[in-house]
């Protein structure tokens, strides 16, 4: 690839594991911060990979859903798997195994758009209290407000409501938004399952996870238990855990996850 793109390999940086030390703090920064210049700088990870570590998503079939502005399904696997027909990412995992990751572009942002821009309210909880018929809604919502990435990978996909009638209520449409996001997350689950990965339960974090109703809808749609970690700040916790491994506090990322995450 470097040859095709006329990139010299000497231009490429050294690759580190996410839990490896890459240096120490610059003396001038250490002085400004009032700390030792021997403070280690650790490679770290991107937001979703760090969130997986911080939510204990290690071990075959372990899963975490990040229900934020976008929606991410992160699934750990002991074997490398690729689905050539769907847009799920396949990578190495920090604990030495592999992971699949599906990222939908609009998740909690769909709910924000519906509540803030269409209904015109900031009281999300009050709106959700009007939803009383889970499993009976005849209104459907496709959450493709910004196109889609996983698993459909179509920038031209667009959102829509389906099944509106004269009897449709505001609560029906609010429910449809929450359910539409949940079913879009399920699309990535189904791709992972088609590769032979067994997912028995999942953790969930992110702003959308603060809604008890939405968590219940996700659990119903996926038909598996949904757990809430004690510390819901997955990315920052994951970064701290990777640093702890680099400093020798834990021998491996998996040991850190199994010890710290509850």
List each language-model region with its residue ranges.
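Short beta-strand to alpha-helix junction loop
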Residues: 18-22
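A short helix-to-beta-strand connector/capping loop
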Residues: 10-11, 37
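Glycine-rich phosphate-binding segment of PLP-dependent enzymes
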Residues: 2-10
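Active-site core segments that coordinate phosphate-bearing ligands/cofactors
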Residues: 3-4, 27-262
